[in-house]
Amino acid sequence: MASHCLLVRCRMARSTVCVLLQILLPSLICATAYAQAPAEKPFLSFVRQTAAELRKQDAPPADLAAWQAQRTLLRQQLELAWGGFPQQHAPLEARILETLDRPDYRIEKIVFQTLPGVFMTASAWVPKISGKLPAVLCVHGHWAGAKQDPHVQARCAGLARLGFFVLAVDAFGAGERAIGEQLGEYHGEMTAATLFPIGRPLSGIQVYENGRAVDYLCSRPEVDPQRIGITGASGGGNQSMYAGAWDERFKAVAPVCSVGTYQAYLGAACCMCEVVPGALAMTEESRILALTAPRALLIISATQDAFQFSVGEAAKSISAARPVFSLYNLPDLPRHTVVESPHDYNQPMREAMYGFMTQHLKGQGTGQPIPEPSISLEEPEALRCYPGTTRPDDWLTLPQFAAREARGLLQSRKPLPPSELRQRLERLLGGTEPGAGTGQLTSPAPGTFELQLKPEAGLQLQLVGRNPKSADAGLRLILTGQGSDHPWVREQQRLAEAAGTGWAVLELRATGRMEVSGDRIGKAPDHNSAEWSLWLGRPLCGQWVRDIRLTAALLREKLPCSSIELVASGTGSFAALAAVAIDENIDGADITGLLTTFVSDKPYVGQRLADMVPGILRDAGDVVHVAELVAPRPLRLHAPVTPQGEPLDAAAANELLSRLQPAWQENSERLKLTAGK
């Protein structure tokens, strides 16, 4: 092993590995599947091929000037993906709620404002040492206790005893900042998904909030603002990597059990807090590491970690980042320490971090591990800013913040010409033009047809259908995410035949026979397939729209039919609406169970992550604005639902209908809305 990579052996009891299993276990399962049979998973194979194609031209910058240009562009792209950051910061309004006195340090329970009305809970571990101190921001991963968790406490206590001012914070939606007041709530899947429509993914909010934590550190008289570091493990490692890359006030950055490659995420189940929409369309993880240069960077990996965080994947990114550090005459950075261990932030990892922070924030030592001083941990409840149920009643949760921002966006929204709105939808969905997609039509029996569809390289879809009874009759394109044998599909076929129209059944990619195994995480039935699509900058909903448009165009070209209407229920309902809204060659839609708004102050329930298109509320509008683009073509809505999957009551249904009716004007008979289950 190269001299810049340190291997540390660690024997530890399983009981010390306290990990949030609902996150890591799916990751490990998917990581195993990665090596077993990728060919058996056509959608995953397609995603990986697409990612590899996007990044095949990556090469080290020729010189420092070339890197500076790449760096500027990448920062612009990242800020765009994160939805931008406020130009003016909300006042910190910091308050110390309580102080715990300990022999070598004191622990202060602190809250401060990061965004208007949004407060971060934190703990400051303040050494009893005079003079300006180096400081370390400790961010947590997906351990249930967040900043209170023993894994986080251990490094806080160790750093404080070694003379560092330490600030441990709760991430938005986790720890004391969860929806409920008990520790252990998960901020990912359909909780974090509420942020996508407003264009503010959780990964970006974490970067901004960790920057506000630095603002707080700089406000403390005990802290030397020129000597600040950041560290965390797992999801906290991702926070460390991104915040360290973005905020140059961090002089030493130490992500733990988190660095790998973006392409390794494709096949794993990772938290929404780790997703940067479109990241693979702009870069690989190595370039994020390179953004830290010329500041100090230590990466700690575990030999028994999941594939996406594995030693080998981390080594790929480190190797690709090292040429950038060399441009600054820093060939020994980034440092890579490998610990024989499962996913963790254990004592050998902490000791490696202590040596690194001591070297780069104190100017002492060579960066070799420093033995951990004796530490005492607190009861998690004793560290809480708001123990038990004492949190203020007006506390703003993550979904409530998303809903507040969404309402503000809609209130300030200006009407857009239909052509511009269609263009915006096309861009937000990642491009839905059929492009070079092809299809071959065969007739296995009189009056029936099969369409072998190749929408993109590496993908093949098969449609079955029945011809219209005459050239004057229409055709219903039935969209399903539950397989062509589902009872609802059979019923739609029967209704079409009774009306004399033809029908075709399209199984949406990544569903039915192409369903991704283990796709559901929590309330998100399509968590992994939708997440992988976001990494590519191609929301899964947009891929469905592309397939729908290609199918409709080929059917119109190859079959005698007077019109093509879309029929959808549940999965694919918003994709159907978006397809007919964008493509004026589709003649209408009959949709059951359509989500009626992206605005939700609670986690989504009964919805698809695929439909939570990043930035759609900000740049286009709500579901109603998309629906208006269908006019004057027929649109029939049955049992539309709330963001929590509940049918609209009569009053809400009437309100929705009244909002839509002006778009149809003299064609009101073409707009139908039926409430209920």
What are these regions (language model features)?
Residues 36-119, 293, 300-474, 482-493, ...:
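Alpha/beta-hydrolase-fold serine-hydrolase catalytic core, especially in secreted/extracellular enzymes
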Residues 131, 136-219, 259-271, 478-554, ...:
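Cap/lid segment of the alpha/beta-hydrolase catalytic domain
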Residues 1-17:
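N-terminal secretory signal peptides that target proteins for export/translocation
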Residues 213-281, 551-621, 625-626:
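Primarily recognizes the serine-hydrolase "nucleophile elbow" in alpha/beta-hydrolase
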Residues 231-235, 240-251, 255-262, 269, ...:
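Catalytic-domain carbohydrate-binding cleft regions of carbohydrate-active enzymes
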Residues 170, 231, 256-257, 300, ...:
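Alpha/beta-hydrolase-fold catalytic nucleophile elbow
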Residues 132-134, 162-165, 224-227, 248-252, ...:
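Loop/turn elements at helix/coil->beta-strand transitions in domains of secreted/extracellular proteins
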Residues 18-31:
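Bacterial N-terminal signal peptides
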